[in-house]
């Protein structure tokens, strides 16, 4: 676009107007493409939010959202780690095989939750980037 814009700057009269119209048409096409990407990203964000809520409910927690942002992230993740610590304390100084399985299952759920949060954040950031480009 910059080269076309610089070329248009050197022109005058009807030639300049024609070149500016070409630039405008190209920009409108780009905006439509970005808007289509944004719409698709919004669809993925809904899916990511469902996945995030599913992973959270597996840990008996829930997130609240404010304009797409997770508004209770700190408190919720603190409660998740507190649950893990409470489970560890309940086992005492030694952990048997059954207790280790419980801990591993909890750790797996926590990892799934963290992955879901990361995916949600990436999609939300993509939408913000597309908004800035539009």
Regions found by a protein language model. Give the residues of each.
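Short, charge-rich amphipathic alpha-helices with coiled-coil/heptad character
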Residues: 1-33
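Extended alpha-helical coiled-coil "stalk/arm" regions
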Residues: 35-73, 80
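Short acidic DE-rich linear segments
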Residues: 1-3, 125-134
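A structural signal for alpha-helical segments
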Residues: 22, 29, 65-68, 72, ...
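Long amphipathic alpha-helical coiled-coil segments
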Residues: 27-42, 47, 86-122
